[in-house]
Each structure stands twice: as C-alpha cells, then as structure tokens.
Amino acid sequence: MFTTIKKTVIGLFTIVRSMWMVNSHALRPRDTILYPEVPVPVPPRFRGRIILSRDPDGDERCVACNLCAVACPVGCISLQKAEREDGRWYPEFFRINFSRCIFCGLCEEACPTTAIQMTPDFEMGEYVRQDLVYEKEHLLISGPGKYPDYNYYRVTGMAVADKPKGAAQNEAAPIDLRSLLP
C-alpha cells in the first residue's frame, strides 16, 4: 500500500514537473525566424549571386581574360572574347550556370579587373533549371559595385583610344627608369 502511494506521488510529481517545463517554454519568445516575412541577416562576407560591374566611365570591366572560368572548380562559367575598334577586349557572351555554381568566390578572387563581384542576394529559386543559366545581360549592373574608383585600364597603363601612355585622362606620364639611376 505504501509503495502504491509512493509511486502515485512520484508519478504526479513528474507530471506536474513536465507540465511546468512545457508551459515555461511555451511562453518564451520563439527562436524560429519566419523567413519570407522577416529577412534573414547575412554575414558581412557572405557570398551570394554573382554580378558583372562597370568602370566609373560606364564601360564593362570584364576584359574576357578567362581567368574566372579557369579558376571555377565546377566549370559553370563560359565566355567568348571579342575586341572593339579601339583595341579593348570585352566578352562577346558571358554565361554562368547557377545550378552548378557552388558560390565559392574563386572567380571573384581571380578577376584582375574586379568585374566579377559577389552580392548578398541568395534568393535564386527557380522551377525550371534552364532559368538558372544567366547571360551577360542578366549579370551586368549599371554601377561599379564594391570598388567605385577602380579602373583597370588606368591602373595597368594600357593605351586607351589610340592615345600614347601618359596622355589619357588622370594618367601620369611614363617613368624613365634610366633617370632614376645614380
């Protein structure tokens, strides 16, 4: 009889304790974020969708050097080089297959002109796989992106628009190395 009362008291105590724990957790604020209504905070170095940026002058930054396609471990980037009348290279077509992309950022690191940049945009869900193949028109933005003052042709010292080195806008004259000798 005593053991039956003891088991009943212990059973009631465990039920009351369980109800107390459930009710205390039910009144706490939720840890779950309701995704579409509440935007997800992304870390500062998050690597999302790839874009192609422009120079401060408004030209495409991409010079079709093909380094991004070589650096890509899954081979989702393809492009074809063409040349303008002034001698500047540009991609005739630039294609990224985001269904194969692993968003590693190696293409951004390999790009010498900072044309390829990663954005914090990650909402790229599609029902048709072909819709995840982005062409140059979809990737090209109107601004310079993360690096607003960088102009590849100004930094490399290449002649622009049939002007000799040092004659372009905001460009210093070439340095004669022999004049620096003692």
Curated annotation (Swiss-Prot):
Quaternary context: NDH-1 is composed of 14 different subunits. Subunits NuoA, H, J, K, L, M, N constitute the membrane sector of the complex.
Annotated Gene3D superfamilies: 3.30.70.3270
Main location class: membrane
Native species: Psychrobacter cryohalolentis (strain ATCC BAA-1226 / DSM 17306 / VKM B-2378 / K5)
Keyword Transmembrane: no
Membrane topology recorded in Swiss-Prot or TrEMBL: Peripheral membrane protein
Subcellular localization: Cell inner membrane
Cofactor(s) listed in the protein's UniProt record: [4Fe-4S] cluster
Binding site for [4Fe-4S] cluster 1: C62, C65, C68, C111
Cofactor note: Binds 2 [4Fe-4S] clusters per subunit.
Listed HAMAP family: NDH1_NuoI
InterPro entries linked to this entry: 4Fe4S_Fe-S-bd (IPR017896), 4Fe4S_Fe_S_CS (IPR017900), NADH_quinone_OxRdtase_chainI (IPR010226)
Role, per record: NDH-1 shuttles electrons from NADH, via FMN and iron-sulfur (Fe-S) centers, to quinones in the respiratory chain. The immediate electron acceptor for the enzyme in this species is believed to be ubiquinone. Couples the redox reaction to proton translocation (for every two electrons transferred, four hydrogen ions are translocated across the cytoplasmic membrane), and thus conserves the redox energy in a proton gradient.
Name of the protein in question: NADH-quinone oxidoreductase subunit I
Taxonomic classification: Bacteria, Pseudomonadati, Pseudomonadota, Gammaproteobacteria, Moraxellales
Example GO molecular function: NADH:ubiquinone reductase (non-electrogenic) activity
Domain 4Fe-4S ferredoxin-type: 50-82, 92-121
EC class name: translocase
GO cellular component terms, A-Z: plasma membrane
